[in-house]
Amino acid sequence: MVGPMGEEMRESMEIAMTLAQHTMAERMKQRVYYDIIVTLGVDEEVMYDGPSAGLAIYISAMGAMLGWESSPEVAVTGEVKRDGSVIRVGGIKNKMRLAALGLISTVLVPVGNAKTLGKSEYEDFGGDLDILGVSHVDEVALGEYHGR
């Protein structure tokens, strides 16, 4: 893992990468090894921290191993726990507002956050966002959101 990140983000990345490795081992019915380098393309002078990137890192790792293509129209946020559950994150309204301002059409968020975002709330952000709730990384690993 390369880039300016705090301890909480580093731990979140390690959890996401471990879960992705376990998911692949289950799929392949054997232990598999991949060399994946996670690089944060961010301002080097700013320290980034927090667990919100866990789901995005998991999806990126799975995509690297399975050859999934990513879409610039999809944004992801969510903390991933060691059991694979995806839990609520803070600042969700600001994240949705920024997504609506960009070219984002679909946002994957923790189910707990999706339930609190009423349609009228994110329409107020000025965008037409398709907000999808995720409760466990298996939903992504099984391809429920693949191709979005």
List each language-model region with its residue ranges.
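Peripheral, non-AAA+ core regions of ATP-driven protein-machinery
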Residues: M1-R148
